[in-house]
Amino acid sequence: MENLIIYAFIYLLGSIPFGLILAKFFAKTDIKKEGSKSIGATNVLRVVKEKNPKLAKKLAIATIILDFAKAAIPLLILKFLHYDQALLWSVAVLAIFGHCFSIYLLFEGGKGIATGAGAMIVLLPLEVLTAFIVWVVIGKIFKISSLASLAALLAFVISSFIFNYDLEIHTHAPVFIIAFIIVYKHLPNIKRLIFKEECKVI
């Protein structure tokens, strides 16, 4: 019963659309109706930037921090309390799933990058550092957020095998689940990348 309560709480916490809330409260803008219609930092930046560039950057940074924290902080607390790895990984997946398929938004949501990073920094910090370096490099070169995010995700998955080469394949199942969720949410971006229609944001 305790685990079920934790899982429910984490999903509800992960579902909180901070980007949407911040944009509505501070910029009086509904990002679900503009831009890519995503609730993540990239769409916050893209949409609010048209009205107030300085505010857009602040709100985008705040969105990243809050989306990151809603996964990282609960996991840090649970890890400190010595909960087992199975529960920690379940919590990580649920936090990301909640962000991407929010119960408050009729199971729509963001792309899962910041929340995923928040979860994985607790469980696989070296892999996240590797992914972050790739994200920065690709972002600097191409200036396309989705491309940088997908490249970082690929680097994360590959490095999870390199840094944990002695683990059996089934132990990577949560990583595959998380990667699948994020790739699924990026399918429209992938389509635009293929047809060279994706906008530059970074």
Curated annotation (Swiss-Prot):
Protein family per UniProt: Belongs to the PlsY family.
GO biological process: phospholipid biosynthetic process
Subunit record text: Probably interacts with PlsX.
Superkingdom field: Bacteria
Protein's name according to its UniProt entry: Glycerol-3-phosphate acyltransferase
Residues that span the membrane, as ranges: 3-23, 61-81, 87-107, 118-138, 144-164, 167-187
Reaction(s) catalysed by this chain's protein: an acyl phosphate + sn-glycerol 3-phosphate = a 1-acyl-sn-glycero-3-phosphate + phosphate
Cell compartments where the protein resides: Cell inner membrane
Gene that produces this protein: plsY
Keyword set includes ATP-binding: no
Single Gene Ontology MF annotation: acyl-phosphate glycerol-3-phosphate acyltransferase activity
A family per Pfam: G3P_acyltransf
GO CC annotations on file: plasma membrane
Described purpose of this protein according to its UniProt entry: Catalyzes the transfer of an acyl group from acyl-phosphate (acyl-PO(4)) to glycerol-3-phosphate (G3P) to form lysophosphatidic acid (LPA). This enzyme utilizes acyl-phosphate as fatty acyl donor, but not acyl-CoA or acyl-ACP.
Membrane disposition: Multi-pass membrane protein
Biochemical pathway: Lipid metabolism; phospholipid metabolism
EC number: 2.3.1.275
HAMAP family for this protein: PlsY
Keyword vocabulary terms for this entry: Cell inner membrane, Cell membrane, Lipid biosynthesis, Lipid metabolism, Membrane, Phospholipid biosynthesis, Phospholipid metabolism, Transferase, Transmembrane, Transmembrane helix
